[in-house]
Amino acid sequence: GTGKTETTLQLARKTGRDVFTIDVSKIKSKWVGESEKAVKGIFKIYRDLCKKKEKMPILFFNEADAVFGKRMENVESSAAQMLNTLQNILLQELESIEGILICTTNLHQNLDPAFERRFIYKVELDKPGEEVRSKIWASMMKGYTQEEYASLGRKYPFSGGQIENVVRKSAVDYI
């Protein structure tokens, strides 16, 4: 809703880079050893892409807290053990990555400190201010006056994603 994914895509566009997006939900498998293979496979594919491309692509983990979250101590369940093993593999891969890694999350407080240390830059995107919200309303809904867009920006402290959802819903309701 605040533009994390869009910022990544615009950064890639502006720098002429491809984005290798990881669907975090597809990493976790109920089958023993499959998640670990998936993670190792992701980094192998990314390393191969880096060798083939003129410009290094961006490795993009959206909603990264699902796999970069705080590790558990004294784990007894097989699911928790699998997640800890998965996280250890991720930590090893991140130690040696030669590329551009971007991770997004709405829950930065849930990230494991070992992962956080490996992120050189941390950028927090807040909800847009009143003026930017007015511009977002204007870009998504045509036919209103500047004063009306300003009023919407003032009245509704929404994120860009929330504004987009309101506009979509109103379009569907109109139909």
Give short role names for the model-derived ranges.
Residues 123, 144-175:
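Conserved AAA+ ATPase small/helical "lid" subdomain
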Residues 1-154:
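Walker A/P-loop NTP-binding motif of AAA+ ATPase domains
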